[in-house]
Amino acid sequence: MTDTPPNAATPNAPVPPAAPGTFVIATAGHVDHGKSTLVSSLTGMEPDRWAEERKRGLTIDLGFAWTSLPSGRELAFVDVPGHEKFLANMLAGLGPAPIACFVIAADKGWQAQSSDHRDAIAALGITHGLVVITRADLAPDTIDATEAEVRAHMRGTPLETAPIVTVSATTGEGLDELITVLDEVTDAAQAPDASARVRLWVDRAFTIRGAGTVVTGTLTAGRLRTGETVRLHGESIDRTVSVRGLQSRNSSTAEVVPQARVAVNLRDVPAEELHRGDALLTPDAWPIVDVLDVRRTMGQPLDAGVVELMAHIGTAAVPVRLRAFDAEHARLTLARPLPLQVGDRIVLRAPGSRNVFAGLLVLDVDPPELSRRGDGARRGRELAERPATGDILAEVARRGAVERSVLTRFGLPVPSRSVPETEALPDGVEAVDGWLVHAPGLAVWVEAAKTLVARELQARPMAAGVPVKALSEGSAAGEPAPARGSERGHPPPADTDHRSCRTRDDRRHGETARPLRRSRRGRGRGRRARKTSGRRAVLGSRG
């Protein structure tokens, strides 16, 4: 797939909107099992983009092709490499894809990367897909045995009951049946939400003469329009940019809706600043986080002792540090922040290993600090009770009060204002304008406010009213205060150990700052300081 942008000479020319009903399918399977040949047979296009790939007959990076089914449904294929050396490239192609096409050759059977790719599909939570047995003409007597082998290896995975189709790209055997099954699989897939916020993980970035910088990716939700402004967040860039033009299926379009492979022509962005793993986002709609709490969905126990790992999220690959709470739950600290939400899937891989270590489900993208002994074990027990979609009551209770839009950005299923609050909100949560408030805390605040108002009016009976500032200062001075929150919730009391008091490194590791150990050279100064001040000296940063 070329994914090339509109001609730069006519970036504002009228173009029709992209047709809906497109589905993106990523291939998977061991090297040299016929993935690229299968895609070529279905689409009439060569997915391998590089001369070296065609010369060696080996897919190295992601390839792209598309076709239309007789039903009118459109398919866009992402062809991934099968060789173990290119596992990171495979995960970048499979990560954003909603449907998987698992390929196994009849003449070779199940092999090492077959297991790796199966594990990646399971870790990513891809629940829609099919299995294609290729090269039926080369080993017709092994078809039944290969199918039984596939069923055995897929047991307990999302593709356990996936349809299996046998084909031969050489003779054309089974291709008609495959097209029918592709229609059925895409029909069963969940319809994408075109009204959702955009998060387009970038898999390629390049420059086209006369057009400028282009990025490509898989649009799984939301919509993109020419002329609109989006946020570009990445390894070396984070700013708003303008969409100069769009293209899908090699045709210019004014708008792209999901699902789709899309090329986005960006205005005034140097291509050298962009990398695979960057993301185009709806502005002010995504939390950019580097600390998150997760649950294991498959793979090795999280308390197995491995601390330094590589996390694959979308098309991004980021080093992470893992702090296990128990075998099933942990805290991840990312080497760089990413746009993430509750419900996202992560693949963990040990450095130097070509195997999947574990699959993760994101439970919290704004977790509480863990500064006291035993906090990790307590947090593990809390997360064990948390549903996969997040816990609105727990998030509101921890903060006391939080803006509704904040929890929406986190990915929690906050009910729309059009739904009666009494029916949609959990017990213990009340809606106050654009805020969600913990009901027990609200009662305390109301009583505290009444007390403060009465005191102020008694002290100044001629005053026109009580300033809001007085209420805030009164709370901080010792009156009943809101429950401890985060910087995104209600302001905490003055003595609260607040996240903003931590350094950037402390925030990244999810821990509070600790006093530095005094060197032998500085002990005398410390004793003199204590004598002079009459209180314990606290070592901090210079300044």
Residue ranges with predicted function:
Residues 2-80:
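Conserved G1/Walker A P-loop phosphate-binding module
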Residues 105-107, 129-144, 165-173, 267, ...:
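G-domain G4 guanine-recognition motif of GTPases
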Residues 136, 152-300:
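Conserved catalytic-core segments of large NTP-driven translation/proteostasis enzymes
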